[in-house]
Amino acid sequence: MTKEVQKSSMSKQTDNKQFWQRWASCYGPLMQSSEPLYAAIAQQMQPHLTPEMNVLELACGSGQLSFRLSRLVRDWEATDFSPKMIAQAKLKPRGAGLHFSVQDATSLPYADETFDAVLIANALHIMPRPEKALAEIYRVLKPGGQLFAPTFVHGEVPRTQLRMLAMRCAGLQIYNSWMVPQYLAFLQAGGFAVQEHALLGDTLAPLCYARAVPDKTRVTQR
């Protein structure tokens, strides 16, 4: 990658970081309207979480899924690249196994094969280089570990396009307007075998829930 492309990618990521910094204090209240969607994601995940698991969550926001699911596992490392989002999450009471920290999903500090599962919810589509995050997820997952990657996708109705336009007008950069087949192909190209997927949400904000495992027979995007 040229220095110019690297600089552009970092600039775009900074733009979205500034967006989340601005919205951190009111993000939790705003997400109350999305409670049914978070509940649906949690319902899909729960059968695959067990008490001995160590889980990494990327792009946790202020903990919408962290608090709900962390009680089901031994250790839950919830991370976000927005310091203000993490500060908001830390204001809430939490169990001993739930930890919050500021981390960059494309450059994680953890050793190889550390986690039994990784969750990244509603984030890959707003990353300028989501393949880097996917490569890091692949690296830190234990053999046989699981990736949970619910992500907003691009629907086929005009309302979806209006939603994305509204988000861009608010200052959030959307880099990948995947349809469901394109999103699943992206995960597969990154070295993951998709085990199941489901379309959640509504026609305004369709979300593709995907559960995948590392496919060690394939070459990942690095």
Feature annotation, model-predicted:
Residues 56-107:
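Class I SAM-dependent methyltransferase SAM/SAH-binding core
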Residues 106-117:
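A short acidic, Gly/Pro-enriched loop at the edge of an enzyme's catalytic core
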